């Protein structure tokens, strides 16, 4: 009887093993790092200006909302002064005053023609090691903005 219970328990444990869920992530050959000669300078400047506008809100507490000629509707709806104020309060406390953005790398997703501008965000406190990614779609509109801790290796997400 003990052996039967042990065998059934073992079967139950093995049968209930969790399975890994595969996330759909772009294949490495779908993401191409662009050389400086391949970068569209007007799109680069637009990404820089719009990214800087978001982070300058932390210094000035004033935000000029994006227009439909600058960003997609989802970005316009998601970036509000309330959300920025909460983020800026944390950033100013931890990293100090925002200084500037420094372009580090540019990648392009060849499947959906999204260009990712990777900027290093410079702050007054030396502990700040942040990055800002500005995603520009094929229509030259900001389709996403993301800030995170700086990591040298690029991972598309």
Placement of each model-derived feature along the sequence:
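Short solvent-exposed beta->alpha transition segments
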Residues: 65-113
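C-terminal motif of bacterial Sec signal peptides marking the signal peptidase cleavage site
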Residues: 14-15
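Acidic, low-complexity intrinsically disordered segments
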Residues: 41, 57, 93, 151-157
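Charged, alpha-helical scaffolding/interaction elements associated with membrane systems
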Residues: 60-61
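Positively charged n-region of N-terminal signal peptides that target proteins for export
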Residues: 1-4
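Hydrophobic alpha-helical targeting segments used for export or membrane insertion
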Residues: 6-11
């Amino acid at each position: 009887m003990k052996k039967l219970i042990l065998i059934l328990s073992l079967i139950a444990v093995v049968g209930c093993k969790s399975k890994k869920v595969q996330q759909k992530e772009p294949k490495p050959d779908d993401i191409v790092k662009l050389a400086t000669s391949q970068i569209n300078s007007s799109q680069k400047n637009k990404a820089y200006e719009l990214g800087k506008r978001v982070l300058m809100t932390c210094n000035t507490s004033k935000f000029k909302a994006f227009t439909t000629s600058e960003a997609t509707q989802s970005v316009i709806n998601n970036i509000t002064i309330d959300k920025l104020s909460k983020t800026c309060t944390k950033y100013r406390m931890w990293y100090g005053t925002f200084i500037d953005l420094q372009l580090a790398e540019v990648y392009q997703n060849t499947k959906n023609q999204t260009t990712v501008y990777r900027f290093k965000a410079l702050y007054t406190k030396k502990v700040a090691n942040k990055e800002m990614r500005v995603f520009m779609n094929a229509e030259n509109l900001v389709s996403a903005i993301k800030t995170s801790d700086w990591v040298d290796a690029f991972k598309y997400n």
